C-alpha cells in the first residue's frame, strides 16, 4: 500500500495546528520574545496533489503577531473561529497591566483577521503560559489549561470570554478534550482522569487507580461515553492505548494494550473523525498510524522531523495526516482510502491458514462419514422421522363405523400400538352393543306362538 508524503518548511517553530476544512489547515508558532528575525505568526496552508501523483503544500495566507510578544503555544479552531494562546511581552505582564494571552482570529477562506483578545489567567508571572486550548464541537465553549501554580483549567464562552467555571486540577494537565455533544470536558494528569460537567462545573466521574508503572500522556473522547488514553511505561520503553467507559457515572476499562515497545514517550495524539485511526508522535520524532480495529501499528514514519513533534492532526475526511515540529517543518501524509480496514501480510496469512484448516477439517469429516456409511444412516433416520410424522396426521381424529346394529364411534391414537388397542376396545363395544340391541328387539316384538299353542290358549 503506497503512501504519498510531503515535508514543507514554514520558516518558524510550530506549536499549534488544526484543519479548518478537508484540504486546509492553520498553524501557529514563532521565535518568541527577543528572538530577532523569527516572526510570531499564524499561517493557513493548503495541501493537494501535484503532477506526478505526489503532494504539494501551498501557503494561502498568514497573520503576523507583535514581534515583542511571546511565541504562540496553543491553538484550536472550529468553523471560522481560531483561538490561540500567546503571552504578551514580559514587561507588560510583570507590570500588572494585563496579559491578553487568549486571542481570537477569523478565517473567511482567503484571509486571517484578528478579532479580539482577553486575559483569563490574571497572572503577573511571564513564565505562566497557556498549555492547551480546546473548543467544543459547536464552538460555544472553550477550555483553557494554564501552567500557573496551582495548576488550573477554565471553561469560558469564546464569544465574550466570560468564565463559566475555573477548576483547580491539583497537577499539571497533560491533555483535555470536550465530548462530542459538548456536555462533558475530560482532562488527564500523569496519573488520573477526571470528567467534568460543562453544565454544572462539577466532577461526574474520576479514575485515580491507574497502574503506577505507567504515565498518562494524551486523551480524546471516542464518543460521548468512551475515552481513549495514550500512556507510556515510567521506567521502560512501550506505548499503551486504553479505552475507558464513563457511562452511568463510573469508569470501566474496556481494553488496554501495548501497541509498541520501541518508543519511550508520546508528544502528540489525534483520532480521526471516523474513529478508526489513531496518530501518535513519539519522542524520537516518528509518527505512528494505529488501526483501532485491531490495535495494530499499520504504518510507521520514522524520524520525519529534525526536532520535537508538537502536534498531529487528521483532516476531517481522514485523507491527510499532518504533523508539525519546532524544527519549522510540516509533514503531510496522504492516507490510502482503504488503509484503516486493510489487513497486513501477517493478518492475511493467518486468515488464509485458518480458512485452509477449516476446509481440510470439513473434508475429513465428510470423508469419514462416507466410509462409515453414515450418510445412509442419516438418510434412513430422516425417512423414519418423516414416516412417523405422516402417521401422526391421524392423531386424535374421530372416526365413525356404520354396522348392521348401529353406528359405532371410535378414537384412533397417534401410534400403531395405541391404534391396535383402540380396535380391540371397539370390538368389545360392538358385542356389547349387539347384545343390547337383541334384548330391545325382543321387548318390542314378542315371539310369535305356534297354531297348536294358540288353540290351547283359546280353549
Swiss-Prot record:
GO cellular-component term (any): Golgi apparatus
One GO term of the biological process aspect: endoplasmic reticulum to Golgi vesicle-mediated transport
Gene3D superfamilies: YVTN repeat-like/Quinoprotein amine dehydrogenase
Membrane topology recorded in Swiss-Prot or TrEMBL: Single-pass type II membrane protein
Name assigned to this protein: Guanine nucleotide-exchange factor SEC12
Subcellular location: Endoplasmic reticulum membrane; Golgi apparatus, cis-Golgi network membrane
Keywords linked to the UniProt accession: Endoplasmic reticulum, ER-Golgi transport, Glycoprotein, Golgi apparatus, GTPase activation, Membrane, Protein transport, Repeat, Signal-anchor, Transmembrane, Transmembrane helix, Transport, WD repeat
Transmembrane segments: 352-370
Protein source organism: Candida glabrata (strain ATCC 2001 / BCRC 20586 / JCM 3761 / NBRC 0622 / NRRL Y-65 / CBS 138)
InterPro entries: Sec12-like, WD40/YVTN_repeat-like_dom_sf
Topological region Cytoplasmic: 1-351
Keyword Disulfide bond tagged: no
Location of the region described as Disordered in the Swiss-Prot/TrEMBL record: 417-459
Positions annotated as WD repeat: 256-291, 294-334
UniProt feature, compositional bias: Low complexity: 422-435
